[in-house]
């Protein structure tokens, strides 16, 4: 039987935030947890299905692969129904979601410790040329940096954090509620197991300070709007020396005056005179790497597409470049002199004297209109 869509399993939108996904998984896991549904095989199957979906969508890289390629993009990366199906197989993910609810049931009964820094997101606007060729860009990010005075510990110089007496350094306290042992973060130390009695004067005991830092971002050739670049450890600094989060740079490519992009292909409109369209000729067509010659055959109609192979965009993950699609647009002459207008009238008369052979499309259209009204 084919797998259900992971977003459908969790009942979440495809653009759901990490917090929304966590809430959705928590709700389902509470409902179908084996402790609440003993000997219920259907509930266990749904619990495993929700766990598998959340394992993938909670991981930024796995989620990106799933969004692009579906289940094929995350096959073999864990999270299958058979992986960790035993009583101890719910592991880290279950402990992360339910460590503060079910005491030890999910293997997450250890001390939580200081919180990892938050991930940051930054939208970087690029020109089409920058996106196609790649570039190095400098960006400025307002963030939390590790405190230089206490080196992230949060404690005043010469002092150390002390063990929390409420939880004995475990970071969690337990309470009995009916059939369940409820395990919660210690309210005194906020789950860290340590208390800072003499806080650092520079950071107020947080171990981090607000700052604006400048980063250099290497943009690979071929990126497009919506692509993300992950800079590991460049997010917010964690509290009390915890690891920093990551920075995700979101690419946004500005509109171009000439080209439109569709995947690896480029599209542009090429204006030509009706003389060139009628008699044929050669035109200079712009590409991102300079001009090329485009041969226009005689009797070319407006709207005709010409494909210049290999003149598009090289894929960001390697491979042959796309194509440049040139749409010919016949331009009507303007600001004509009296003499030019007279020449055109004579030219029109010569066309009409030749019967239908000079304008077959026009005559076919009028014939179609005539048949349409004749049937009314």
From Swiss-Prot:
Zn finger (CR-type) location: 134-212
InterPro entries noted in UniProt: DnaJ, DnaJ_C, DnaJ_domain, DnaJ_domain_CS, HSP40/DnaJ_pept-bd, HSP_DnaJ_Cys-rich_dom, HSP_DnaJ_Cys-rich_dom_sf, J_dom_sf
Domain (J): residue spans on this chain: 5-70
GO annotation, cellular component aspect: cytoplasm
Positions contributing to Zn(2+) 1 binding: 147, 150, 200, 203
CXXCXGXG motif repeats: 147-154, 164-171, 186-193, 200-207
Main location: cytoplasm
Example GO biological process: DNA replication
Record's comment describing the protein's domains: The J domain is necessary and sufficient to stimulate DnaK ATPase activity. Zinc center 1 plays an important role in the autonomous, DnaK-independent chaperone activity of DnaJ. Zinc center 2 is essential for interaction with DnaK and for DnaJ activity.
Assembly behavior: Homodimer.
Protein name: Chaperone protein DnaJ
């Amino acid at each position: 039987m084919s797998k259900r869509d992971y977003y459908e399993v969790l009942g979440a939108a495809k653009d759901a935030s990490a917090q929304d996904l966590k809430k959705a998984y928590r709700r389902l896991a509470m409902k179908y947890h084996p402790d609440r549904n003993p000997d219920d095989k259907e509930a266990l199957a749904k619990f495993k299905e929700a766990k598998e979906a959340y394992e993938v969508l909670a991981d930024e890289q796995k989620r990106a692969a799933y969004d692009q390629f579906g289940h094929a993009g995350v096959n073999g990366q864990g999270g299958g129904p058979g992986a960790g199906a035993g009583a101890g197989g719910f592991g880290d993910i279950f402990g992360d979601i339910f460590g503060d609810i079910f005491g030890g049931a999910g293997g997450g009964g250890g001390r939580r410790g200081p919180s990892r820094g938050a991930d940051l997101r930054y939208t970087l606007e690029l020109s089409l040329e920058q996106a196609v060729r790649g570039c190095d860009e400098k960006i400025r990010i307002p963030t939390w940096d590790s405190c230089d005075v206490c080196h992230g510990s949060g404690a005043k110089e010469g002092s150390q954090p002390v063990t929390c007496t409420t939880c004995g350094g475990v970071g969690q306290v337990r309470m009995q509620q009916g059939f369940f042992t409820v395990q919660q973060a210690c309210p005194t130390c906020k789950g860290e197991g340590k208390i800072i009695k003499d806080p650092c004067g520079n950071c107020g005991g947080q171990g981090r300070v607000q700052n604006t830092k400048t980063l250099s971002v290497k943009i690979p050739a071929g990126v497009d709007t919506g692509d993300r670049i992950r800079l590991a450890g460049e997010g917010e600094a964690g509290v009390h020396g915890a690891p920093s989060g990551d920075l995700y740079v979101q690419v946004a490519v500005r509109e171009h005056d000439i080209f439109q992009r569709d995947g690896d292909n480029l599209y542009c409109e090429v204006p030509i005179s009706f003389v060139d369209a009628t008699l044929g000729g050669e035109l200079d067509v712009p590409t991102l790497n300079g001009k090329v010659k485009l041969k226009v055959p005689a009797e070319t109609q407006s709207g005709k597409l010409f494909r210049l192979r290999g003149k598009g965009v090289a894929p960001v993950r390697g491979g042959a470049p796309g194509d440049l699609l040139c749409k010919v647009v016949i331009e009507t002459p303007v600001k004509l002199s009296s003499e030019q207008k007279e020449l055109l009238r004579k030219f029109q008369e010569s066309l009409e004297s030749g019967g239908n052979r000079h304008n077959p499309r026009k005559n076919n259209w009028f014939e179609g209109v005539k048949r349409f009204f004749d049937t009314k």
